[in-house]
Design a protein with these regions (language model features):
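P-loop NTP-binding core
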Residues: 1-259
Length: 259
Protein backbone atom coordinates (compact mmCIF):
# COMPACT_ATOMS: atom_id res chain seq x y z
CA UNK A 1 0.00 0.00 0.00
CA UNK A 2 1.30 3.43 -0.99
CA UNK A 3 0.27 6.39 1.15
CA UNK A 4 -0.46 9.77 -0.44
CA UNK A 5 -1.06 12.80 1.78
CA UNK A 6 -2.80 15.87 0.41
CA UNK A 7 -1.83 18.89 2.45
CA UNK A 8 -1.24 22.61 2.51
CA UNK A 9 -1.34 24.98 5.46
CA UNK A 10 -3.37 27.46 3.44
CA UNK A 11 -7.12 26.95 3.04
CA UNK A 12 -9.25 27.51 -0.04
CA UNK A 13 -6.84 25.89 -2.48
CA UNK A 14 -8.77 22.72 -3.31
CA UNK A 15 -7.10 20.39 -0.83
CA UNK A 16 -10.16 18.34 0.12
CA UNK A 17 -11.54 18.32 -3.43
CA UNK A 18 -8.18 16.98 -4.59
CA UNK A 19 -8.15 14.17 -2.02
CA UNK A 20 -11.77 13.24 -2.71
CA UNK A 21 -11.31 13.26 -6.49
CA UNK A 22 -8.07 11.28 -6.52
CA UNK A 23 -9.53 8.62 -4.23
CA UNK A 24 -12.71 8.36 -6.33
CA UNK A 25 -10.88 8.12 -9.66
CA UNK A 26 -8.35 5.58 -8.37
CA UNK A 27 -11.16 3.37 -7.11
CA UNK A 28 -13.99 3.82 -9.58
CA UNK A 29 -12.04 4.24 -12.82
CA UNK A 30 -8.65 2.63 -12.19
CA UNK A 31 -9.85 -0.35 -10.16
CA UNK A 32 -7.46 0.30 -7.29
CA UNK A 33 -8.41 -0.57 -3.72
CA UNK A 34 -8.37 2.74 -1.87
CA UNK A 35 -8.50 3.66 1.79
CA UNK A 36 -9.47 7.32 2.12
CA UNK A 37 -8.46 8.79 5.48
CA UNK A 38 -9.84 12.02 6.90
CA UNK A 39 -7.12 13.61 9.03
CA UNK A 40 -8.83 17.00 9.29
CA UNK A 41 -11.01 17.79 12.29
CA UNK A 42 -13.43 19.66 10.01
CA UNK A 43 -14.40 16.30 8.52
CA UNK A 44 -15.02 17.72 5.06
CA UNK A 45 -13.91 14.71 3.04
CA UNK A 46 -16.07 12.53 5.32
CA UNK A 47 -18.99 14.79 4.36
CA UNK A 48 -18.24 14.49 0.64
CA UNK A 49 -18.39 10.71 1.01
CA UNK A 50 -21.60 10.87 3.09
CA UNK A 51 -20.03 9.29 6.16
CA UNK A 52 -19.61 12.22 8.54
CA UNK A 53 -20.98 11.79 12.06
CA UNK A 54 -20.21 14.37 14.79
CA UNK A 55 -20.14 11.58 17.39
CA UNK A 56 -18.80 8.83 15.14
CA UNK A 57 -15.65 6.78 15.62
CA UNK A 58 -12.71 7.07 13.26
CA UNK A 59 -9.36 8.81 13.21
CA UNK A 60 -9.41 9.80 16.89
CA UNK A 61 -9.88 6.19 17.98
CA UNK A 62 -7.22 5.02 15.52
CA UNK A 63 -4.64 7.30 17.16
CA UNK A 64 -5.71 6.98 20.80
CA UNK A 65 -7.47 3.64 21.28
CA UNK A 66 -5.96 1.27 18.74
CA UNK A 67 -4.82 -2.12 20.00
CA UNK A 68 -1.22 -1.29 19.03
CA UNK A 69 -1.21 1.25 21.90
CA UNK A 70 -3.18 -0.86 24.36
CA UNK A 71 -6.68 0.01 23.17
CA UNK A 72 -9.47 -2.23 21.93
CA UNK A 73 -9.87 -1.14 18.29
CA UNK A 74 -8.47 -2.92 15.27
CA UNK A 75 -7.93 -0.81 12.16
CA UNK A 76 -10.72 -2.66 10.38
CA UNK A 77 -13.15 -1.72 13.18
CA UNK A 78 -12.75 1.92 12.15
CA UNK A 79 -13.04 1.51 8.38
CA UNK A 80 -16.39 2.18 6.69
CA UNK A 81 -17.50 1.36 3.19
CA UNK A 82 -18.60 4.24 0.96
CA UNK A 83 -21.19 4.48 -1.83
CA UNK A 84 -18.35 4.24 -4.35
CA UNK A 85 -16.65 1.18 -5.79
CA UNK A 86 -13.29 0.22 -4.23
CA UNK A 87 -13.19 3.20 -1.83
CA UNK A 88 -13.40 2.75 1.95
CA UNK A 89 -12.96 5.51 4.51
CA UNK A 90 -11.76 6.32 8.02
CA UNK A 91 -13.66 9.42 9.07
CA UNK A 92 -12.86 12.38 11.30
CA UNK A 93 -14.74 14.95 13.34
CA UNK A 94 -14.15 17.61 15.98
CA UNK A 95 -12.80 15.05 18.45
CA UNK A 96 -9.48 15.24 16.58
CA UNK A 97 -8.79 18.52 18.37
CA UNK A 98 -8.85 16.68 21.68
CA UNK A 99 -6.78 13.86 20.23
CA UNK A 100 -4.07 16.27 19.12
CA UNK A 101 -3.86 17.70 22.62
CA UNK A 102 -3.75 14.26 24.22
CA UNK A 103 -0.95 13.10 21.94
CA UNK A 104 1.00 16.29 22.51
CA UNK A 105 0.86 15.75 26.26
CA UNK A 106 1.82 12.09 25.92
CA UNK A 107 5.58 11.70 26.27
CA UNK A 108 5.75 8.12 25.03
CA UNK A 109 8.00 7.52 22.03
CA UNK A 110 5.20 6.04 19.95
CA UNK A 111 3.11 9.20 19.86
CA UNK A 112 4.04 9.99 16.23
CA UNK A 113 4.23 6.38 15.05
CA UNK A 114 0.64 5.41 15.80
CA UNK A 115 -0.83 5.91 12.34
CA UNK A 116 1.99 3.91 10.76
CA UNK A 117 1.45 1.06 13.23
CA UNK A 118 -2.30 0.98 12.58
CA UNK A 119 -1.80 0.95 8.80
CA UNK A 120 0.36 -2.17 9.02
CA UNK A 121 -2.84 -4.15 9.62
CA UNK A 122 -4.27 -3.24 6.21
CA UNK A 123 -1.18 -2.69 4.08
CA UNK A 124 -1.95 -5.79 2.01
CA UNK A 125 -5.66 -4.99 1.65
CA UNK A 126 -5.39 -1.67 -0.20
CA UNK A 127 -3.32 -0.39 -3.10
CA UNK A 128 -3.45 3.23 -1.96
CA UNK A 129 -4.15 5.18 1.19
CA UNK A 130 -5.20 8.76 0.34
CA UNK A 131 -5.17 11.16 3.29
CA UNK A 132 -6.86 14.55 3.48
CA UNK A 133 -4.69 16.37 6.03
CA UNK A 134 -5.68 19.29 8.22
CA UNK A 135 -4.20 22.74 7.78
CA UNK A 136 -1.89 22.54 10.80
CA UNK A 137 1.17 20.38 11.25
CA UNK A 138 -0.38 18.94 14.40
CA UNK A 139 0.10 15.52 15.95
CA UNK A 140 -2.44 13.92 13.61
CA UNK A 141 -0.76 15.23 10.46
CA UNK A 142 2.71 14.43 11.81
CA UNK A 143 1.56 10.84 12.38
CA UNK A 144 0.36 10.68 8.77
CA UNK A 145 3.56 12.14 7.32
CA UNK A 146 5.73 9.61 9.13
CA UNK A 147 3.89 6.92 7.12
CA UNK A 148 3.61 8.81 3.82
CA UNK A 149 5.28 8.04 0.50
CA UNK A 150 4.15 11.14 -1.41
CA UNK A 151 2.88 14.53 -0.29
CA UNK A 152 0.77 16.30 -2.89
CA UNK A 153 0.89 20.04 -2.25
CA UNK A 154 -2.02 21.84 -3.96
CA UNK A 155 -0.96 25.37 -4.84
CA UNK A 156 -3.24 28.15 -6.01
CA UNK A 157 -1.26 30.70 -7.99
CA UNK A 158 -1.71 34.23 -6.77
CA UNK A 159 -0.56 34.55 -3.20
CA UNK A 160 2.29 33.29 -1.05
CA UNK A 161 2.69 30.04 -2.96
CA UNK A 162 6.50 30.34 -2.91
CA UNK A 163 6.47 30.65 0.88
CA UNK A 164 4.09 27.70 1.22
CA UNK A 165 6.38 25.50 -0.86
CA UNK A 166 9.47 26.56 1.10
CA UNK A 167 7.72 25.95 4.43
CA UNK A 168 6.59 22.49 3.39
CA UNK A 169 10.06 21.63 2.13
CA UNK A 170 11.53 22.59 5.50
CA UNK A 171 8.94 20.63 7.47
CA UNK A 172 9.42 17.49 5.40
CA UNK A 173 13.18 17.75 5.79
CA UNK A 174 12.72 17.74 9.56
CA UNK A 175 10.74 14.49 9.27
CA UNK A 176 13.18 12.61 7.05
CA UNK A 177 15.02 11.14 10.02
CA UNK A 178 11.80 9.21 10.70
CA UNK A 179 10.71 8.67 7.09
CA UNK A 180 13.45 8.92 4.48
CA UNK A 181 11.21 7.92 1.57
CA UNK A 182 8.83 10.90 1.84
CA UNK A 183 8.79 13.30 -1.10
CA UNK A 184 6.64 16.16 -2.35
CA UNK A 185 4.96 16.94 -5.64
CA UNK A 186 3.25 20.24 -6.42
CA UNK A 187 -0.20 20.35 -8.00
CA UNK A 188 -1.41 23.68 -9.33
CA UNK A 189 -5.11 24.14 -8.62
CA UNK A 190 -7.84 26.65 -9.45
CA UNK A 191 -5.75 27.68 -12.46
CA UNK A 192 -6.76 30.81 -14.33
CA UNK A 193 -5.26 31.58 -17.69
CA UNK A 194 -3.77 35.02 -17.08
CA UNK A 195 -0.25 36.35 -17.55
CA UNK A 196 0.77 36.23 -13.89
CA UNK A 197 -0.50 32.70 -13.36
CA UNK A 198 1.21 31.43 -16.48
CA UNK A 199 4.51 33.06 -15.48
CA UNK A 200 4.48 31.55 -11.99
CA UNK A 201 3.39 28.19 -13.38
CA UNK A 202 6.26 28.22 -15.86
CA UNK A 203 8.73 29.10 -13.09
CA UNK A 204 7.47 26.30 -10.85
CA UNK A 205 7.75 23.71 -13.60
CA UNK A 206 11.00 24.84 -15.19
CA UNK A 207 13.14 26.75 -12.70
CA UNK A 208 12.04 26.10 -9.12
CA UNK A 209 13.73 22.73 -8.80
CA UNK A 210 10.47 21.30 -7.46
CA UNK A 211 8.70 18.20 -8.73
CA UNK A 212 5.40 19.31 -10.28
CA UNK A 213 2.48 17.64 -11.98
CA UNK A 214 2.33 18.55 -15.66
CA UNK A 215 -1.43 18.90 -15.32
CA UNK A 216 -2.79 22.06 -13.73
CA UNK A 217 -6.33 21.82 -12.36
CA UNK A 218 -8.49 24.56 -13.79
CA UNK A 219 -11.00 26.62 -11.88
CA UNK A 220 -14.70 25.93 -12.45
CA UNK A 221 -17.96 26.73 -10.70
CA UNK A 222 -18.85 23.04 -11.13
CA UNK A 223 -16.33 22.12 -8.43
CA UNK A 224 -17.98 24.54 -6.01
CA UNK A 225 -21.41 23.09 -6.83
CA UNK A 226 -20.14 19.57 -6.13
CA UNK A 227 -18.89 20.70 -2.72
CA UNK A 228 -22.24 22.31 -1.93
CA UNK A 229 -23.99 19.05 -2.85
CA UNK A 230 -21.47 17.08 -0.75
CA UNK A 231 -20.55 14.73 -3.56
CA UNK A 232 -17.09 13.91 -4.99
CA UNK A 233 -16.57 16.02 -8.10
CA UNK A 234 -16.10 13.12 -10.58
CA UNK A 235 -19.43 11.66 -9.41
CA UNK A 236 -21.19 15.03 -9.62
CA UNK A 237 -19.90 15.84 -13.11
CA UNK A 238 -18.07 13.05 -14.89
CA UNK A 239 -16.98 15.07 -17.91
CA UNK A 240 -16.48 18.63 -16.66
CA UNK A 241 -13.09 20.24 -17.27
CA UNK A 242 -11.96 19.90 -13.64
CA UNK A 243 -12.80 16.19 -13.55
CA UNK A 244 -10.85 15.78 -16.78
CA UNK A 245 -7.92 17.56 -15.14
CA UNK A 246 -8.05 15.30 -12.09
CA UNK A 247 -8.26 12.29 -14.37
CA UNK A 248 -5.01 13.43 -15.99
CA UNK A 249 -3.49 13.97 -12.54
CA UNK A 250 -4.33 10.38 -11.60
CA UNK A 251 -2.76 9.12 -14.82
CA UNK A 252 0.42 11.01 -13.93
CA UNK A 253 0.22 9.76 -10.36
CA UNK A 254 0.00 6.11 -11.36
CA UNK A 255 2.94 6.49 -13.73
CA UNK A 256 4.91 8.12 -10.91
CA UNK A 257 4.01 5.57 -8.22
CA UNK A 258 3.97 2.40 -10.30
CA UNK A 259 6.24 3.18 -13.25
Amino acid sequence: MKTIAIMNQKGGIGKTMTAASIAYLLGEEQGKKVLLVDADQQGNVSMLYDRYKPEGIGMSELLERHRSVGGSYKTTDLIQTTPYHNVDIITANGYLMRTNMNLLLNEKEDQILRFAAAMLEVQDVYDYCVVDCGLLLDMTVTNVLVATDLVILPVKIGGFEIEAIANMDEQLEDLRSLNNRIRMKILMTMRQKNKTSLQVEAWLKESSGQDCFVTAVRRSIIAEKATMQRVPLPKFSKNCIVTQDYRNVVTELLKDMEG
